[in-house]
Amino acid sequence: MANNVSRDVPQDQSSVAQARKPWYAFATVAAGRFVRFASRVTKHGGSALPGKVVEKIDPGFLTRTLGQLPLGVVLVSGTNGKTTTTRMGASMLSDLGLKVFTNPTGSNFVRGVVSALLTEVTLGGKLDADSAVLELDEAYAVHFVKQVKPRYALLLN
Protein backbone atom coordinates (compact mmCIF):
# COMPACT_ATOMS: atom_id res chain seq x y z
CA MET A 1 0.00 0.00 0.00
CA ALA A 2 1.31 3.43 -0.87
CA ASN A 3 2.55 5.71 1.89
CA ASN A 4 0.60 8.68 0.62
CA VAL A 5 -2.99 8.82 1.78
CA SER A 6 -5.57 9.97 -0.71
CA ARG A 7 -8.25 12.23 0.70
CA ASP A 8 -10.34 12.07 -2.44
CA VAL A 9 -13.96 11.14 -1.95
CA PRO A 10 -15.05 8.18 -4.10
CA GLN A 11 -17.17 9.14 -7.11
CA ASP A 12 -20.37 7.61 -5.76
CA GLN A 13 -20.13 9.65 -2.56
CA SER A 14 -19.04 12.99 -4.00
CA SER A 15 -22.49 14.57 -4.09
CA VAL A 16 -23.23 13.62 -0.48
CA ALA A 17 -19.84 14.45 1.00
CA GLN A 18 -19.02 17.68 -0.81
CA ALA A 19 -17.98 20.58 1.39
CA ARG A 20 -20.76 22.48 3.11
CA LYS A 21 -20.83 26.16 3.94
CA PRO A 22 -19.24 26.97 7.34
CA TRP A 23 -22.60 27.90 8.89
CA TYR A 24 -24.00 24.51 7.87
CA ALA A 25 -21.17 22.65 9.61
CA PHE A 26 -21.74 24.78 12.70
CA ALA A 27 -25.50 24.12 12.66
CA THR A 28 -24.98 20.37 12.21
CA VAL A 29 -22.53 20.03 15.11
CA ALA A 30 -24.53 22.38 17.34
CA ALA A 31 -27.77 20.45 16.71
CA GLY A 32 -26.07 17.12 17.41
CA ARG A 33 -24.52 18.42 20.63
CA PHE A 34 -27.86 19.86 21.76
CA VAL A 35 -29.60 16.51 21.18
CA ARG A 36 -26.83 14.74 23.12
CA PHE A 37 -27.20 17.22 25.99
CA ALA A 38 -31.01 16.91 26.02
CA SER A 39 -30.80 13.10 25.93
CA ARG A 40 -28.46 13.01 28.88
CA VAL A 41 -30.43 15.55 30.91
CA THR A 42 -33.56 13.44 30.44
CA LYS A 43 -31.57 10.29 31.33
CA HIS A 44 -31.92 8.70 27.88
CA GLY A 45 -28.21 8.00 27.31
CA GLY A 46 -27.47 9.98 24.17
CA SER A 47 -25.13 7.56 22.40
CA ALA A 48 -27.19 7.00 19.22
CA LEU A 49 -29.86 9.69 18.87
CA PRO A 50 -27.40 12.56 18.23
CA GLY A 51 -25.87 10.51 15.42
CA LYS A 52 -29.29 9.86 13.92
CA VAL A 53 -30.10 13.58 13.95
CA VAL A 54 -26.76 14.51 12.38
CA GLU A 55 -27.22 11.85 9.66
CA LYS A 56 -30.60 13.39 8.78
CA ILE A 57 -29.28 16.96 8.72
CA ASP A 58 -26.03 16.19 6.90
CA PRO A 59 -25.71 12.71 5.33
CA GLY A 60 -22.08 13.40 4.35
CA PHE A 61 -20.91 14.34 7.86
CA LEU A 62 -19.24 11.00 8.63
CA THR A 63 -17.50 10.71 5.25
CA ARG A 64 -16.29 14.29 5.28
CA THR A 65 -15.17 14.31 8.91
CA LEU A 66 -13.22 11.04 8.83
CA GLY A 67 -11.87 12.03 5.41
CA GLN A 68 -9.82 14.72 7.19
CA LEU A 69 -7.61 12.09 8.83
CA PRO A 70 -4.19 12.03 7.13
CA LEU A 71 -3.49 8.42 8.20
CA GLY A 72 -7.00 7.14 7.61
CA VAL A 73 -9.25 4.81 9.56
CA VAL A 74 -8.61 1.42 11.15
CA LEU A 75 -11.82 -0.60 11.40
CA VAL A 76 -12.13 -3.31 14.08
CA SER A 77 -15.07 -5.68 13.72
CA GLY A 78 -16.07 -9.22 14.60
CA THR A 79 -17.84 -11.35 17.16
CA ASN A 80 -15.46 -11.18 20.13
CA GLY A 81 -12.57 -8.96 21.24
CA LYS A 82 -13.51 -5.72 19.47
CA THR A 83 -13.27 -3.43 22.47
CA THR A 84 -9.95 -4.83 23.70
CA THR A 85 -8.40 -4.79 20.22
CA THR A 86 -9.65 -1.25 19.56
CA ARG A 87 -8.22 0.03 22.84
CA MET A 88 -4.89 -1.71 22.26
CA GLY A 89 -4.61 -0.36 18.71
CA ALA A 90 -5.51 3.18 19.76
CA SER A 91 -3.07 2.98 22.66
CA MET A 92 -0.21 1.79 20.44
CA LEU A 93 -0.79 4.58 17.93
CA SER A 94 -1.01 7.14 20.75
CA ASP A 95 2.26 5.83 22.19
CA LEU A 96 3.84 6.56 18.81
CA GLY A 97 2.83 10.20 19.25
CA LEU A 98 -0.21 10.16 16.99
CA LYS A 99 -3.52 11.82 17.82
CA VAL A 100 -6.10 9.05 17.63
CA PHE A 101 -9.88 9.32 17.52
CA THR A 102 -11.85 6.32 18.75
CA ASN A 103 -15.39 5.51 19.87
CA PRO A 104 -14.76 4.73 23.55
CA THR A 105 -18.39 4.52 24.67
CA GLY A 106 -18.96 1.14 23.07
CA SER A 107 -21.66 2.51 20.80
CA ASN A 108 -20.33 0.40 17.95
CA PHE A 109 -22.60 1.19 15.04
CA VAL A 110 -22.54 4.00 12.48
CA ARG A 111 -24.74 6.38 14.48
CA GLY A 112 -22.62 5.73 17.55
CA VAL A 113 -19.47 6.73 15.65
CA VAL A 114 -21.19 9.92 14.46
CA SER A 115 -22.25 10.66 18.06
CA ALA A 116 -18.69 10.09 19.29
CA LEU A 117 -17.37 12.46 16.60
CA LEU A 118 -19.60 15.23 17.98
CA THR A 119 -17.52 15.33 21.17
CA GLU A 120 -14.26 15.67 19.25
CA VAL A 121 -14.95 17.99 16.31
CA THR A 122 -14.90 21.76 16.52
CA LEU A 123 -18.11 23.66 15.88
CA GLY A 124 -16.72 24.18 12.38
CA GLY A 125 -16.53 20.42 11.83
CA LYS A 126 -12.74 20.02 12.08
CA LEU A 127 -11.32 16.85 13.65
CA ASP A 128 -7.90 17.23 15.27
CA ALA A 129 -6.55 13.70 14.87
CA ASP A 130 -4.10 11.79 12.70
CA SER A 131 -5.99 8.51 12.57
CA ALA A 132 -9.08 6.75 13.90
CA VAL A 133 -9.39 3.27 15.38
CA LEU A 134 -13.07 2.40 15.36
CA GLU A 135 -14.96 -0.53 16.83
CA LEU A 136 -17.97 -1.54 14.77
CA ASP A 137 -20.46 -4.33 15.24
CA GLU A 138 -20.12 -6.81 12.38
CA ALA A 139 -23.69 -6.13 11.22
CA TYR A 140 -23.01 -2.38 10.92
CA ALA A 141 -19.50 -2.54 9.46
CA VAL A 142 -20.99 -3.08 5.99
CA HIS A 143 -22.99 0.15 6.30
CA PHE A 144 -19.92 2.00 7.58
CA VAL A 145 -17.66 1.00 4.68
CA LYS A 146 -20.27 2.29 2.22
CA GLN A 147 -19.55 5.75 3.65
CA VAL A 148 -15.93 5.51 4.77
CA LYS A 149 -13.23 3.43 3.14
CA PRO A 150 -10.97 2.24 5.98
CA ARG A 151 -7.25 2.10 5.36
CA TYR A 152 -7.03 -1.10 7.42
CA ALA A 153 -9.63 -3.55 8.69
CA LEU A 154 -9.16 -6.01 11.54
CA LEU A 155 -11.76 -8.77 11.45
CA LEU A 156 -11.97 -10.88 14.59
CA ASN A 157 -13.75 -14.10 15.38
Please provide the spans of the model-predicted regions.
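Actinobacteria-biased recognition of intrinsically disordered, low-complexity terminal regions
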Residues: 3-5
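Phosphate-binding loop of NTP-binding sites
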Residues: 7-157
